[in-house]
Regions:
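Bacterial Sec-dependent N-terminal signal peptides
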Residues: 1-29
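Functional beta-strand-loop-alpha-helix junction segments that form "active/interaction loops"
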Residues: 65, 69, 92, 531-532, ...
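Alpha-helical scaffolding within the catalytic cores
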Residues: 513-516, 559-564, 595-599, 618-621, ...
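Extended, charge-rich low-complexity interaction segments
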Residues: 583-603, 683-702
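Non-catalytic propeptide/linker segments at domain boundaries
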Residues: 377, 381, 385-553, 557, ...
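Long, solvent-exposed N-terminal ectodomains/accessory regions
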Residues: 30-402
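Catalytic cores of nucleophile-dependent amide-cleaving enzymes
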Residues: 600-685
Length: 731
């Protein structure tokens, strides 16, 4: 209902007649609205308009979903049903004006909470249906002086939370019971939020019971809160539960975080505090103890017994693998192998195995191919010890191991180190049961690996196993498995061009075979490109080459102390912003990047192409600064192929060019120049055509063959396709 014209009418009548409390009929079919309540109706109208805009369409409807039926119901709830609640308030027999204002104000608050939640993606669109119907029912109960608790119990946590925080029900007799119910509900449905909620509500009736639950399910969180000095921490410390008390004891120790990975074995007296204390005196002994414990825990997980603090153990194992070993051998990448790999010479095959699988994102290609991988076989008692290695680690992280072997071109060698029958069983296991994982990581590992499998027999075996799993999922009605294996099947078939599969059309995702030039432009028709350089030796070497490649009539340059701006003089307006590779030891390169980021933000310059230049250890810094406006991301660094999922968390539909092994400056630069010049000329980026040209340019060399174009980034495509499928189902 629009109140803008009415407001002007009221002001005119007040001026002419000097009336207060004047009532005007909004229309023949709608109740009269006294002037004293017009403001509250207008606030509701304003919030309705804000919600309509959330779907990104400039119209009078709210249709945020892909499902037309859901869109119609959402739009009807926002307009007709909200209006009918306003009418019901005005036409009700409520005598007290303040009560009517209370309900109008509460309705607006509920809509505003939905608006904020949906805008910042903390609630989904169907919650609006619950909020509108729930508000109406709660209002009826409240008018009758009855508890709203029965109504709140009917709804999801998100809807219930919006309703109980509406001003209208502040004095309802069922408010506290409703809030307690919702607190229990969210703790059950979202255990990751339990400690945060309890810390804010230490007097919650079920706090003591939930503390014990947290000790068994979220021990890491309980450890953090137990070390604090507040009322909730006191409740934790006063718990009589033995496991809670063990966690409290560890939290009080200066080196408690180093003990925490062993919580389960400490609680079962399988290891003593003294044993851990002794290992702590030597980083290498501590790493060995972590590996030994991880294998023990992995065996228990295999037998469906999840140990306490396994997350903390794996986090610490990854930290120590990087800190004590991998960072060292990475840092010596220019030294002879006999010096470089001296640090890992005495490690067991199992300890070397965990160096690999725990440092996927940081280990250099050469650290893996020249060091960790061959050193494992030097330590094994038999050359054909592939299956023995996996048995010794209880098949822990075996999918990650297979994926890395595929990506680093050692999978064929690894599979030959076991009997053919065992190799086939392993690869079937690699593909099976992907739906059982809580995350998509295993499925993405399978997707990433397939194109790197060179053995046609193994590739065929994996393909057939995917088809078998898809058929089984269809027969059993397992929707998650069906989605995973249907997408994998489509991806793997698409690799053979004779199948003529258009992944974008088949999977319902944005184009991956080409990037339209218009999609790279901002509202002013500009293409903004940001490039990250780092101030190490590589950065200082390749930066001048980059600058010199644009010294021609098509470009002009400007420079300050921290960055260079390169702008096109012909064709589409393209501007490249690249920070200077200032001294990384003094942090000057990071300062330059920060200053450039601020400049781009202040001037409303949103990069649609982002280029990372540097080693893989710099990549986390680039990703931390990655703009969510990016449509094309180029990761020309060693190991960058492992970071696709991180990019897609920030830019869900970005196209990605990456290297699965060694990114090379002499390949990066010609690629960058070609792509940018295509954009300057107003051309769409046709990836198959461009990649064919690159193949000729680089003579299909090994370094070039490790670069992955957007339409071959199967892991990235899998994530996009799966997220799209889940969104469609939710709608």
């Amino acid at each position: 209902m629009s109140m803008i014209k009415l407001k002007k009418t009221y002001l005119l009548l007040i001026f002419v007649f000097g009336l207060s409390g004047f009532a005007v009929a909004q229309s023949a079919a709608r109740p009269d609205i006294p002037l004293v309540r017009v403001y509250f109706h207008e606030k509701i109208d304003s919030t309705q308009k804000l919600i309509r805009k959330l779907d990104g369409k400039n119209d009078e409807f709210f249709k945020p979903a892909d499902n037309e039926d859901l869109n119609n119901r959402l739009d009807k709830a926002l307009t007709e049903r909200v209006d009918s609640i306003q009418d019901a308030i005005e036409s009700s027999k409520i005598a007290d004006n303040n009560d009517k204002i209370r309900y109008l104000r509460g309705l607006n608050e509920a809509l505003q909470r939905f608006y904020i939640g949906f805008k910042y993606q903390t609630v989904k669109s169907p919650v609006l249906l619950e909020v509108v119907s729930g508000y109406k029912n709660c209002m009826v109960l409240d008018q009758k002086k009855q508890s709203i608790f029965p109504e709140i119990k009917r709804h999801s946590y998100d809807a219930g939370d919006i309703l109980v925080n509406a001003y209208a029900f502040n004095n309802n007799e069922g408010l506290q019971a409703s809030k307690d119910f919702l607190t229990l509900k969210v703790c059950h449905e979202h255990p990751d939020r339990m400690m945060t909620i309890l810390s804010k509500n230490p007097d919650f009736p079920y706090t003591d019971s939930l503390i014990v639950v947290a000790a068994h399910t979220r021990p890491d969180d309980l450890y953090t809160y137990a070390a604090a000095y507040n009322k909730f921490a006191e409740r934790i410390r006063n718990s009589p539960d033995s496991l809670v008390q063990l966690i409290v004891r560890i939290s009080k120790m200066p080196t408690g975080r180093m003990f925490f990975p062993f919580l389960d074995n400490l609680s079962k007296n399988k290891i003593s505090f003294d044993e851990v204390e002794t290992a702590l005196k030597d980083d290498e002994k501590y790493y060995s103890l972590l590996v030994k414990t991880e294998i023990d825990y992995a065996d228990r997980v295999r037998r469906r017994d999840t140990p306490l603090s396994i997350i903390a153990l794996r986090r610490k194992l990854a930290d120590k693998a990087s800190e004590v070993y991998v960072n060292v051998i990475n840092g010596l990448h220019e030294s002879p192998d006999n010096i470089r790999f001296r640090k890992i010479a005495n490690l067991s095959p199992e300890e070397l195995y965990y160096l690999a699988v725990m440092t996927e994102d940081v280990i250099y290609t050469s650290s893996y191919t020249h060091g960790v991988y061959p050193f494992i076989w030097k330590k094994m008692k038999t050359a054909k010890g592939g299956d023995s290695l996996l048995l010794s680690v209880k098949f822990d992280y075996f999918r990650k191991w297979v994926k890395m072997a595929a990506n680093y071109n050692t999978l064929d060698d690894f599979l030959k180190r076991m009997d053919k029958g065992n190799a086939q069983i392993l690869m079937k296991a690699f593909v099976n049961g992907l739906e059982k994982s809580a995350t998509l990581e295993d499925a993405v590992d399978v997707a990433d690996s397939y194109a790197s499998i060179n053995d046609k027999a193994i590739q065929s075996l994996v393909m057939n196993q995917v088809k078998n799993n898809l058929q089984q999922a269809n027969q059993t009605g397992n929707k998650k498995a069906e989605n995973i294996y249907d997408i994998l099947n489509t991806l793997f078939l698409s690799i053979d061009s004779s199948n003529h599969i258009d992944l974008s059309e088949k999977l319902g995702i944005p184009p991956i075979y080409f990037m339209p030039n218009k999609d790279m432009r901002d509202a002013k028709g500009r293409i903004i490109i940001q490039q990250f350089f780092y101030g190490d030796e590589d950065g200082r070497t390749f930066f001048p080459m980059f600058i010199n490649s644009f010294r021609n009539a098509n470009w002009k340059m400007q420079s300050n102390n921290q960055w260079v701006t390169i702008s096109s003089t012909k064709g589409v307006p393209v501007t490249i912003y690249t920070n200077k590779p200032l001294d990384e030891k003094q942090g000057l390169d990071a300062q330059a990047q920060g200053a450039l980021n601020q400049y781009l933000y202040d001037n409303d310059l949103n990069p649609t192409m982002v280029i990372h230049r540097g080693h893989s250890y710099w990549l986390p810094s680039t990703l931390d600064q990655l703009s969510d406006s990016a449509r094309l991301v180029m990761l020309g660094s060693c190991g960058a192929y492992q970071n696709l999922s991180k990019v897609l968390q920030i830019c869900p539909t970005a196209q990605i060019i990456s290297s699965k092994q060694t990114g090379a400056g002499n390949i990066n630069q010609p690629m960058i120049n070609t792509i940018i010049d295509e954009l300057r000329q107003g051309k769409d980026l046709n990836w198959p055509v461009i990649w064919k040209r690159f193949g000729v340019l680089f003579n299909h060399g090994d370094l070039f063959n490790d670069y992955i174009p957007p339409y071959r980034n199967l892991g990235a495509v899998f994530i996009m396709a799966y997220q799209k499928e889940v969104m469609n189902e939710e709608d």
